[in-house]
Amino acid sequence: MIQGGDPKSRDAKPGQMLGDGELGYTIPAEFVTGLYHKKGALAAARQGDQVNPQKASSSYQFYIVQGNTWTADRLKMVEDRYGKKFTPEQAEVYATLGGTPFLDGDYTVFGEVVEGLEVVDKIAAVPCGPMDRPIEDVKMKMTVIER
């Protein structure tokens, strides 16, 4: 998984801690059928359930799912442990493409990488320092395609 969006990151010094930039508001959780945490999903980060039981999304931080492939047995374990139910389509995608199914229904997915999944893997593989920040900054540029 790769994460970005902190407004402080544009001018951050090497090694500076990121992730606590504020815009002063959150966005209500929105769980849409058909949008789930398959590899390449674009989702909103958020604070944990202890301080955010409404699962409201960050107004600025996002992540892109990388994830591994999942066998039927492992998906069944996720269903049992987290009380989730996956459609046959989701099970097929998680088995072939991969993702992070245990996050479904807990974090808002609002888009996906439609081209360049190999870039997600390359970004996820860069050497990182403390707090999982890349030693050399990786700048991401995104284009929004509306359907």
Residue ranges and their predicted role:
Residues 1-147:
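Cyclophilin-like peptidyl-prolyl cis-trans isomerases
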